């Protein structure tokens, strides 16, 4: 009985912690502004478009971190650089045989 109680207490604690973590992740992302509708006044539409522009700027902003450091960019360039031999040859680049 005691082990069963400890088991369910652990399950409940884990589920509660997961709900808290999911809630904090959901609050961290900005919510999309509400559309005022078809027959909305011009002032409401202006506010909506301003909020929408702000929302798009937030979710598409450039993030700076380790990937934007010069060393990381140089490594990426070296890894992705292709030499001339790695490009496939096209059949139409060669002269016609007939």
From Swiss-Prot:
Keywords: Amidation, Cleavage on pair of basic residues, Neuropeptide, Secreted, Signal
Modification Tyrosine amide occurs at: 64
Signal peptide: 1-28
GO annotation terms (biological process): feeding behavior; neuropeptide signaling pathway
An annotated Gene Ontology molecular function: neuropeptide Y receptor binding
Matches recorded under CDD domains: PAH
InterPro entries: Pancreatic_hormone-like, Pancreatic_hormone-like_CS
Localization terms from the record: Secreted
Gene Ontology cellular-component terms listed: extracellular space
Main location: secreted
Pfam family, one: Hormone_3
Family listed: Belongs to the NPY family.
PANTHER family: NEUROPEPTIDE Y/PANCREATIC HORMONE/PEPTIDE YY, PRO-NEUROPEPTIDE Y
Function per UniProt: NPY is implicated in the control of feeding and in secretion of gonadotrophin-release hormone.
Stated name of the protein: Pro-neuropeptide Y
Recorded name of the encoding gene: npy
């Amino acid at each position: 009985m005691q082990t069963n109680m400890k088991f369910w207490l652990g399950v409940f604690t884990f589920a509660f912690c997961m709900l808290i973590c999911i809630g904090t992740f959901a609050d961290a992302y900005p919510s999309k502004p509400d559309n005022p509708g078809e027959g909305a006044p011009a002032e409401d539409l202006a506010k909506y478009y301003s909020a929408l522009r702000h929302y798009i700027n937030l979710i598409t902003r450039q993030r700076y971190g380790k990937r934007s450091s010069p060393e990381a960019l140089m490594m990426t360039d070296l890894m992705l650089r292709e030499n001339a031999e790695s490009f496939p040859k096209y059949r139409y680049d060669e002269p016609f045989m007939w």
